[in-house]
């Protein structure tokens, strides 16, 4: 699963997922899966969607992942009293805004790209739309 090799600090503030999207253009491929909602994608969700997409295209084309989970999410263990500091890092997330490109694909037909992105988007917690050049 995706996660940073090293970070300056182990834990991060919760923060807010606001603002406008930065990478809303297709850079590498010819088709793209674009987010419609605002949310957080876990690294395991990103990986399972990638697997579904690559299996659907039967390794014909090329797939690019345009998001990276760089925000640590902490959790305290079950049945632990409040206080005693912040919990341990449980998983990593990527913050997603509307219009953000999640995956790109090239080397396949439009129908196959639509089918593959439909299978991949079912693994993600945000609504998505397929776009092309």
From Swiss-Prot:
Pfam families with a match to the protein in the record: Ribosomal_L16
SUPFAM superfamilies, alphabetized: Ribosomal protein L16p/L10e (SSF54686)
CDD domains: Ribosomal_L16_L10e
One cellular component (GO) term of this entry: cytosolic large ribosomal subunit
The keyword Methyltransferase is annotated on this UniProt entry: no
GO-annotated biological processes: translation
InterPro entries tied to this protein: Ribosomal_uL16, Ribosomal_uL16_bact-type, Ribosomal_uL16_CS, Ribosomal_uL16_dom, Ribosomal_uL16_sf
Annotated GO MF terms: rRNA binding; structural constituent of ribosome; tRNA binding
Keyword list, A-Z: Ribonucleoprotein, Ribosomal protein, RNA-binding, rRNA-binding, tRNA-binding
Subunit structure, as described in the record: Part of the 50S ribosomal subunit.
HAMAP family: Ribosomal_uL16
Family: Belongs to the universal ribosomal protein uL16 family.
Function, as annotated: Binds 23S rRNA and is also seen to make contacts with the A and possibly P site tRNAs.
Name listed for the protein in its UniProt record: Large ribosomal subunit protein uL16
Organism: Blochmanniella floridana
């Amino acid at each position: 699963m995706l996660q940073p090799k090293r970070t300056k600090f182990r834990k991060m503030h919760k923060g807010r997922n606001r603002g406008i999207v930065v990478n809303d253009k297709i850079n590498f491929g010819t088709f793209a899966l674009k987010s419609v909602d605002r949310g957080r994608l876990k690294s395991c969700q990103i990986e399972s969607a990638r697997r579904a997409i690559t299996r659907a295209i039967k390794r014909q084309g090329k797939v690019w992942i345009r998001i990276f989970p760089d925000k640590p999410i902490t959790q305290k263990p079950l049945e632990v009293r409040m206080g005693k500091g912040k919990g341990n890092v449980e998983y990593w997330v990527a913050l997603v805004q509307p219009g953000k490109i999640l995956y790109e694909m090239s080397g396949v037909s439009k129908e196959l790209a639509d089918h593959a992105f439909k299978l991949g988007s079912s693994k993600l917690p945000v609504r998505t739309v397929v776009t092309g050049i």
